[in-house]
Amino acid sequence: MATPVEPPNGIRTPGKHYYSMWQSLFEIDTKYVPIKPIGRGAYGIVCSSVNRETNEKVAIKKINNAFENRIDALRTLRELKLLRHLRHENVIALKDVMMPIHRRSFKDVYLVYELMDTDLHQIIKSSQTLSNDHCQYFLFQLLRGLKYLHSANILHRDLKPGNLLINANCDLKICDFGLARTSSGKDQFMTEYVVTRWYRAPELLLCCDNYGTSIDVWSVGCIFAELLGRKPVFPGTECLNQLKLIINILGSQREEDIEFIDNPKARKYIKSLPYSPGTPFSRLYPHAHPLAIDLLQRMLVFDPSKRISVIEALQHPYMSPLYDPNTDPPAQVPINLDIDEDLGEETIREMMWSEILEYHPEAATAAMEVVL
C-alpha cells in the first residue's frame, strides 16, 4: 500500500492528497482512495484505486516529468487526443486526467483508466491452460477492437500481448496508443521508439514508405500464433534476423510477392536469403483447431496486399460462432491524429492542458471567465 505523506512544501492544495510510492510522490485528487501500487516501467508508475464518487475501480498512471523527453511527451499527447474520442468495449477507456495545479509549469501527468486484472503477455507466459475457446475469444475481441480503430482511420502500430489488457472474465481491451497514427498520415514511422520488433510487419522491417491497416493485421497474426504456441513465433534478435525468421517459416517468396518492396537494397536482401520451403503452421501448432490454422496463415502473409483484412478475419469461419456484424457499429467519425513532430515543450504542454480541460468542464468554464 502507498504511504500517506505531507506535501513537499508543507502547503496542501485543496482537493489533493499525497502518497509516497516506490520513492515517487503521488499528488492525486482526494476522490481516489486508497491507492495501491500495481506496476512500474519506463512510462511511469501505475496504481489501483477506487473513485469514491462512483465506486468504480480505476488504474492511475503517473507519468513522471512528462515533458523531459519530447518524443515521450508527444506519445502522451497522442494518447490523450485519441482516447477522448474512442468508445468501444474492446478499447481501454480513459476515465479522467487529473487537473494540474499550475498551467505553465506542471511536470507530471496523472491518467485514470478503467482497471483491468492483467495482460495477455502475463497469461501466455503463465501455466494457465488456454483452450481453443480462450484463443478464439481473445482473438475475436482483438479483431473487434481493431475493426473499430480502423473505422476511425486509426492504425495502432504497436499491438503486442503486453498492450492487450485482460480481466477475470476474459474481457480484452486494447491499450497504449502512444504510437497510433491516422492511416493517411505522412509522418516518419521509424522514430527512435519503434514498434516491438517481434510483431512488426515485413513492410515495416523493409522500410517501405506506404503501409496501411495490414501492419496491424500482421501483429494480430503474431499474437494469435503466440497464443497457440505459448511463445513468440518470430523472436528476432535484430531487423535482418527478424526477416530471416519470417522467411524460414513462411518460405521463400515469389517475385510477385516482393513487388511491394520499393527499396532496391531491401528487395535484393530478401532475394539473397537461402531458399526455404517454409514450415506449415499445422506442424508448428499440431493441437490447434484446423480453422485457427487457416485464419493464421491468411493473416501472416508476407505481401501486405494479399493479407486478410480485419473485417475478412471476423467473417472467417473460425470467428463465425462469435461475430455478429449487426452488433458491431463503426466509429462515429474518423479521427485526425496528425500532430507536428517538431513541436516544442511549451507548445506540447499547452496542448496537453487543453486536452485535460476536456475532462474538467468546470475548470474550462472558469478559465473562459478569466479570459473574458
Curated annotation (Swiss-Prot):
One of the GO biological process terms: intracellular signal transduction
Residues annotated as domain Protein kinase: 32-319
Keyword Kinase: yes
Positions of modified residues (Phosphothreonine): T191
Known cofactor(s): Mg(2+)
CDD domains referenced in this protein's UniProt entry, alphabetically: STKc_TEY_MAPK (cd07858)
Tissues expressing the protein: Ubiquitous.
UniProt keywords, alphabetically: ATP-binding, Kinase, Nucleotide-binding, Phosphoprotein, Serine/threonine-protein kinase, Transferase
SMART domains: S_TKc (SM00220)
GO MF annotation list: ATP binding; MAP kinase activity; protein serine kinase activity; protein serine/threonine kinase activity
Keyword Kinase: yes
Superkingdom field: Eukaryota
A Pfam family that the UniProt record links to this protein: Pkinase
Mechanisms controlling activity: Activated by tyrosine and threonine phosphorylation.
Post-translational modification: Dually phosphorylated on Thr-191 and Tyr-193, which activates the enzyme. Very low autophosphorylation, although dramatically increased when Mn(2+) is added to the reaction instead of Mg(2+).
Cellular component terms per the entry's GO annotation: cytoplasm; nucleus
Residue span of motif TXY: 191-193
Residues annotated with Phosphotyrosine modification: Y193
Entry's EC annotation: 2.7.11.24
PANTHER family linked to this entry: MITOGEN-ACTIVATED PROTEIN KINASE (PTHR24055)
Name of the protein this chain belongs to: Mitogen-activated protein kinase homolog NTF3
Phylogenetic lineage: Eukaryota, Viridiplantae, Streptophyta, Embryophyta, Tracheophyta
